[in-house]
C-alpha cells in the first residue's frame, strides 16, 4: 500500500496516517511511515525512524509538466531544463540533520539533475556522520547518472525505482492532452 496523507492540512495533521497506524498496532500489519517533511523534528516528535518521500522532500517535479530537473534542456519546451526546488545547501543540511538523528531518509528525484543533487546530499551526510545500516534511498530515479549510481553503490544508497504514472487512473492526465 502506498499512500500519501496529511497534504493540505494545517498543523501537519496526518489523519489517514493516524487511522492506518492505529489499526496496524492491533492486526500485525507492518507500516513504514515516512513523514513528508524536511523538518527532522516532525519524525522525532512522533518517534518515527524515517523521514522523506515526496511532496516537501521532492527535489524536482515530473516530466509531464516539464519541471523534472534536467542536466540538459527539454527539447520541446523552449529550452527549459526543469526546476530544482531547493539549493544544494538546504538539501545537504536536511540530510545531515536527519542522518545524525539516526533517521532513514527518502527523497524524490525524477530528473538527472535532481538525482545528482540527492546523491551529493546523502554522500555529504554519510561523510559527515557515517552509518552502516542507514537505508537511505532516492525515489523514482528515472534518469540516474553514472556518477550518481557510483555514489549510490559506494554508499549503499537504495534506488527504489518508480515509473511514471502515465496510465494510472488516479493521475490527473488532462495536462498531457494539451
Model-based region annotation:
Residues 2-112, 116, 120, 151, ...:
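Metal-coordinating catalytic core of metallo-dependent amide/deamination hydrolases
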Residues 21-22, 123-126, 176-178:
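Short, hinge-like loop/turn segments at secondary-structure boundaries
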Residues 24-29, 125-133:
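Short helix-capping segments at alpha-helix termini
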Residues 38-42, 139-148:
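Short, conserved secondary-structure transition motifs
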Residues 80-82, 134-136, 174-176:
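Short, contiguous strand/loop micro-motifs
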Residues 85-87, 140, 178:
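A general structural motif
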Residues 131-141:
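Beta-strand segments within the central parallel beta-sheet cores of soluble alpha/beta enzyme folds
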Residues 143-178:
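Active-site-adjacent C-terminal substructures of enzyme catalytic domains
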